[in-house]
C-alpha cells in the first residue's frame, strides 16, 4: 500500500477524528462492537473496540488480505485507552531473511515466547490513556537475530479505545511531535 510512497517522519494509518478512520482497515466483530464515540477524558472522538472474546473482535490493516502495508518506518506508535479488560495487538513484519514474523503484545500474558514465526509478549498498560511505542527493528533483532525490512500488517484486538496509530522514523519527544499527533487532556476546572 505504501511501498512506493516517500516515507519519512510520520505516517498515520488510523486517526479517530478523520472523516473515515477505518477507510484502509477491515473490521471483524463477534459479540461486541467497533464504533466511534466521544471519550469523556479527552472530550474528543475515539474508536472503541469492544468484544466478549479478544480474538474475534478486531480491526486489521490493510483491509485486503492479499495486500501488505510496505511501511519501512521502524517505530509503531499506538495511542490507546486502557479499558481494564483483555487487550492485544499484533504486527506482522518482513525481515532480511524474507521471513514474515508476527509480534503479539497483550495485557493478559505474563511471559515472552519466541517461536519461529510469532513472538508473544506481555504488555503493561497504565490506567487511562497510553502511548505505546514499539521499536520493530529492535524487537526483530532481539527475537530473531535478523534485520527489520518493513511492516506488512497491523491488527488491533478488543478491548480498547484508539486515538491514533502511526509509524515514525525515530522516537520523538513530546515537544517535537506535531500538534495532531499529541494527546491533549482537557484542563480540569477546579
UniProtKB/Swiss-Prot annotation:
Q: Does the keyword Mitochondrion apply?
A: no
Keywords in alphabetical order, please.
Answer: Cell projection, Cilium, Cytoplasm, Cytoskeleton, Flagellum, Microtubule
Q: What does this protein do?
A: Cilium- and flagellum-specific protein that plays a role in axonemal structure organization and motility. Involved in the control of flagellar beating in an asymmetric and planar waveform. Stabilizes outer doublet microtubules (DMTs) of the axoneme and may work as a scaffold for intratubular proteins, such as tektin and PACRG, to produce the beak structures in DMT1, 5 and 6. Not essential for flagellar assembly.
Name of the protein in its database record: Cilia- and flagella-associated protein 20
Instruction: Provide the GO biological process annotations.
Output: axoneme assembly; cilium assembly; establishment of protein localization to organelle; positive regulation of cilium-dependent cell motility; regulation of cilium beat frequency involved in ciliary motility
Subcellular localization, per the record?
Answer: Cytoplasm, Cytoskeleton, Flagellum axoneme; Cytoplasm, Cytoskeleton, Flagellum basal body
State the GO CC annotations. axonemal central pair; axonemal doublet microtubule; axonemal microtubule; ciliary basal body; microtubule associated complex; motile cilium
Pfam families recorded for this chain? CFA20_dom (PF05018)
InterPro entries in the record, alphabetically? CFA20/CFAP20DC, CFA20_dom
Q: What induces or represses expression of this protein, per its UniProt record?
A: Up-regulated during flagellar assembly.
Family of this protein: Belongs to the CFAP20 family.
Knockout or disruption consequences: Exhibit erratic movements with cells continuously turning around the body axis. Display longer and sharp kinks flagella. Flagella beat in a uncoordinated and deformed non-planar manner. Lost beak-like strucure projections in B-tubules of the outer doublet microtubules (DMTs) 1, 5 and 6.
